C-alpha cells in the first residue's frame, strides 16, 4: 500500500500513541455509519423549541423528561434541547455516533481495554477518558425496566454517545421506539435533512488518535493542513482545532485562548443557496453581520478561500446563532468540507 505525503504528515503528531494502535489487530472495534445527534444545553427549552421549530419545522421525535428531541429530516437523527442546570453555561454539549451492531456490554469492554474508566457512582457525566452507562426509565422516555445508554468523554473531555443505528432517543432495549412523534407547532421557513459535521476545540494531543483507534476515522478532505475526519461512508466529518493531535495544523498554540469543547455544529439541507438562506434568516428576525461574532440571533457568511481548500472566490460557509448564542452552520447536504462552491468536492486522498 502506498503512503501519500498527506497521510504521513497527518500521522506524525500521533506517534506517541502508536504502541497502543499497534497492539490492536484487525479493523477498528466500532463501525460508525455517521453522526446521529447534537445536544444543545439551553437556558430555556421552551424558547429554544419555539425558535428551532419556527425555523426548521422540526417535529418532536421523543421526550426525556424536560429534554426535547427534535427530528432531523426523516429521522432517527435528532437535535436535543436539554435544560441547563443552575449555574451551567449554555453550550453545544454532546454529539452522537450511530454504530453498526451496537452492544453496550461489548462497548464497555472495548473502552476498558483502552484504559477508560467508569465515572464515579452518581456522576452526572463522565470526565475525560471516562464513560457512564445510564439506565433511562419510563419517566424519562425509556422502557419500564430501563433503556441503557452509553456516554463517553474523549481525552479532551468532549462528550459523545454511541448507540445503535436505529436509536431515536426513545424506549426499548436499543432506544429505538419512538411512537409518539409530535408534529411541529410551527411550519418552519426552511428544512434541514441531515447532520453534517462538528468542529471541536481540543486540548489533548491524544484526542484525534483516540477517535482513529475506536472508529478508524481517516481524512476525507483538508482545509489547509487541517483534516476533515470522515465519519461513516457518507460526507459526515469531525474537524479539530487546538491541540488535538493527528494534524500539523494543530500545534496547540491557540488552545488556551478558546473554550475547550464543541465550537459549532453543522446541519445539511437540500439545494443550499447562501443568499436565499441568509434572507430567510433575516426575515425570521436574525441580524446579518459582517464579522463572525457570536451574539445571539445573528447570521454571517465566511468565505473559505483556496489556501484553505475552498473554491476560487471562496466557498461560502453560513452560520447563525440561536437565542443562547450557540453557533450552527448550514450547508448543502453534499458538503464534505472540500472544494467547490458547495464544498462538496472531496476527491479520494
Locations of the language-model features?
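Core segments of cupin and vicinal oxygen chelate
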Residues: 30, 39-78, 198-246
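Sec-exported extracytoplasmic/periplasmic mature domains
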Residues: 53, 57, 100, 112-116, ...
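Short, surface-exposed linear segments at secondary-structure transitions and domain or protein termini
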Residues: 87-93, 172, 247-252, 339-341
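Short beta-strand/turn micro-motifs at beta-sheet edges
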Residues: 24-28, 82-85, 184-187, 249-255
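Short, charged/polar, Gly/Pro-enriched secondary-structure boundary elements
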Residues: 75-80, 89, 157-160, 169, ...
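Vicinal oxygen chelate
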Residues: 2-18, 22-28, 33-44, 68-71, 84-191, 199, ...
Amino acid at each position: 500500500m502506498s503512503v501519500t505525503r498527506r497521510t504521513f504528515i497527518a500521522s506524525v503528531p500521533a506517534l506517541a500513541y502508536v504502541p497502543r494502535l499497534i497492539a490492536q489487530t484487525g479493523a477498528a472495534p466500532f463501525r460508525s455509519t455517521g453522526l446521529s445527534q447534537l445536544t444543545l444545553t439551553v437556558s430555556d427549552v421552551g424558547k429554544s423549541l419555539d425558535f428551532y421549530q419556527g425555523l426548521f419545522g422540526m417535529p418532536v421525535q421523543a421526550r426525556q423528561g424536560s429534554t426535547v428531541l427534535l427530528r432531523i429530516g426523516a429521522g432517527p437523527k435528532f437535535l436535543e434541547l436539554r435544560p441547563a442546570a443552575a449555574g451551567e453555561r449554555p453550550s453545544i454539549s454532546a454529539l452522537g455516533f450511530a454504530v453498526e451492531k451496537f452492544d453496550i456490554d461489548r462497548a464497555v469492554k472495548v473502552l476498558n481495554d483502552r484504559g477508560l474508566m467508569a465515572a464515579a457512582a452518581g456522576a452526572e457525566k463522565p470526565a475525560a477518558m471516562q464513560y457512564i452507562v445510564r439506565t433511562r426509565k419510563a419517566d424519562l422516555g425509556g422502557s419500564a425496566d430501563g433503556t441503557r445508554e452509553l456516554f463517553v468523554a474523549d481525552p479532551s473531555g468532549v462528550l459523545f454517545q454511541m448507540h445503535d443505528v436505529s436509536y431515536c432517543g426513545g424506549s426499548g432495549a436499543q432506544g429505538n421506539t419512538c411512537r409518539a412523534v409530535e408534529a411541529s407547532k410551527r411550519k418552519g421557513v426552511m428544512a434541514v435533512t441531515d447532520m453534517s459535521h462538528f468542529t471541536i476545540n481540543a486540548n489533548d494531543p491524544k484526542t484525534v488518535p483516540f477517535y482513529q483507534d475506536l472508529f478508524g476515522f481517516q481524512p476525507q478532505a483538508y482545509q489547509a493542513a487541517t483534516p476533515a475526519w470522515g465519519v461513516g461512508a457518507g460526507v459526515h466529518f469531525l474537524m479539530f482545532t487546538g491541540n488535538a493531535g493527528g494534524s500539523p495544523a494543530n500545534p496547540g498554540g491557540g488552545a488556551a485562548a478558546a473554550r475547550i469543547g464543541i465550537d459549532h455544529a453543522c446541519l445539511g439541507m437540500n439545494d443550499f443557496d447562501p443568499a436565499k438562506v441568509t434572507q430567510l434568516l433575516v426575515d425570521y428576525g436574525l441580524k446579518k453581520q459582517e464579522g463572525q461574532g457570536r451574539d445571539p440571533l445573528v447570521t454571517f457568511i465566511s468565505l473559505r478561500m483556496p489556501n484553505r481548500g475552498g473554491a476560487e472566490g471562496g466557498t461560502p460557509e453560513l452560520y447563525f446563532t440561536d437565542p443562547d448564542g450557540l453557533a450552527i452552520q448550514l450547508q448543502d447536504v453534499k458538503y464534505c468540507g472540500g472544494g467547490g462552491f458547495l464544498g462538496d468536492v472531496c476527491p479520494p486522498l
